Amino acid sequence: MSNNIIDAVTQTVNSLVSALKLPDESAKANDTLGSMNFPQFSRILPYKDYDSATGLFINNKTIGFMFEARPLPGADKSIVATLEHLLRSKLPRGVPVSFHLVSSKLVGNDIDYGLREFRWSGKQAKKFNAITQAYYLRAAETKFPLPPALDLPLTLRNYRVYISCCVPRKKNSTTQIVEMENQIKILRASLGGAYIPTRILDAAGLVELMRELINPDPHEMYRVPYKLDPYQDLNYQCVDDSFDMQVTAGHLKIGRLGRDGKECVTRVTSYHLESDPEMAFLWTSADNYANLLNPELSISCPFVITLTLMVEDQVKTQNEANMKFMDVEKKSKTSYAKFFPNVIKEMQEWGDIRQRLATNQTSLVSYFFNITTYTADSTEASLAAEQQVLNSYRKGGFQLIPARYHHLRNFLAMMPFKCGEGLFKELQAAGVVKRAETFQVANLLPIVADSPLAPAGLLAPTYRNQLAFIDLFYEGMNNTNFNMAVCGTSG
């Protein structure tokens, strides 16, 4: 027994002596580790710098601009005609342009500011003000308390619309800068003609938006302040230091540390169009995510609706329409039409499109329609949100499908400028990009949402869950009669 112990000790000592005689490889190992590229989500974001003089963002391969627009409270034929003319004659050809409708639950700051003049007074003021604030914050986090017979997804949200566009960057090209500045003026004037006022988004606005979309917290109701670092690239400032992502077949899991230091996980799911909708109207587009007549057909979780479109070259589409028409016309005059009778209808459709393209009455547009939802990391919450999205849009004639195995791709497509960096071509190769005429695409734009009315006053949420305040003397409400107003609050 003693011999075995002595042999074991001897073997251990010999191993240590041999290890000490070997050359030290720690320095080489450290050099190897230092040369390795570890995966960072910020590395795939294109944002680099912002030029405040021109209002342009400098990205990896592109240069572009971004607007924040006020959502339309409604629409009519004249607004649709103005937007169709904008798509057909004002947008650059072959350039992806993205429209983003963001439904945010970060309404805590707006609630505090809006209720500052409607606060309780007296000895119990602090207590009752806290109860009122907690009531509305709880409604934004989950939903308003209703009787058991009324299980409606009524909550509080803030809707915002963003428009982004970028073109391939040319080195040391002053002409391109001037062209982009002119493009900004043209688009803002055209959107103003459709009663859509805009403002140019700067670097701080972009970073704040991206930090909200990339670093979600299902329990956070307040915007987290962030001070922009002028000496660091924008893409690194968009991602939280504690960011973590897990990619699965059915969803994305984004984790981060909350303000309390505890880890919070959000489940992100994407949906895109299975086929072109047969009929769509701009004035009913808001009913797809918050139906007024059927409130149960609403999306209660935070979401982002993204429509990325690219107006195709007019000459190429004219040639394509001519070739298609001649091909189906030839088939319609043979026995082929007896076995496939739809070829007659197809010939008529391509004939009409060819005529409208030849007279510049329309243009063909390639577009990608995507919805991204944010829910708590639970199967029940994810399934409930999925049914809300699919059922709400099915009511409006839209057939959506979950982006199984492609949630990361769709998540990246949701981000501004990402499609202009080459992702749109990947979407086309994947077969998820649809084609339609400018009139149909104008009716698909996600730009209709309820108005917040006034920044402060009597809190009166809308049926579409928009956080709104009523102040009859606020100039932004465009009131013309101030003779008498009667209002009341709880208590």
Task: Explain the meaning of each model-derived region.
Residues 55-62, 70-72, 79-91, 188, ...:
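Glycine-rich phosphate-binding loop of nucleotide-binding enzymes
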Residues 147-149, 355, 446, 452-457, ...:
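Glycine-rich, charged/polar anion/phosphate-binding loops
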Residues 2-445:
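Extended, folded cores of ATP/NTP-driven motor/assembly subunits in large transport
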Residues 431-465:
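Pre-P-loop entry segment of helicase/translocase ATPase cores
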